[in-house]
Amino acid sequence: VLKALGDSLHLDALTVTGETIGQLLASAEIRNPAVIRPKSAPWHPEGGTVVLYGNLAPDGAVVKQSAVREDMRAFRGRARVMDSERAALEALGSGAVHEGDVLVIRYEGPKGGPGMPETLAVTLALAHSGLRRVALVTDGRFSGATEGPCVGHVSPEAYIGGPIAGVEEGDEVEIDIPNRLLRVRNTDP
């Protein structure tokens, strides 16, 4: 991997061996170019993870776009608001979450969690629920195993008064990965 990135590295930087990165890479070879591809021929034109911004995440939110089906990369849905992962799991288990919903889980961020616990249980439950058009938005975090339209690290978080704290049941939430947007529209008359 370092050999493929060579021209982007500081080749004169010392390594723990006492040699520079350039010296170490001089004899390195890429054995399988189908696996370690050159920058000129990437698997995808963009990285797997991107940052979204908008009125729901003025300081940003993270989504693993490489794990989101093409038909879900631009999605609008009705907010189903939960103040904990446990409440979200109960809602999924009771059948209260339906196609077209956006499950909004708040107060799971660094201060609200506290400690920003991983919201793995709800992402697994959602992945195995059979629901194909449901998204998840949280100020909590995900593991690398998360798949589907799961937007995490919404910042600022609910606990410190971030916009996610003001999302109400039934509000329209828009996730637009190609345009890097995460927005909410209040649906009160």
Task: State where each predicted segment sits.
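Catalytic or ion-coupling anion/metal-binding cores of large enzyme and transporter domains
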Residues: V1-P189
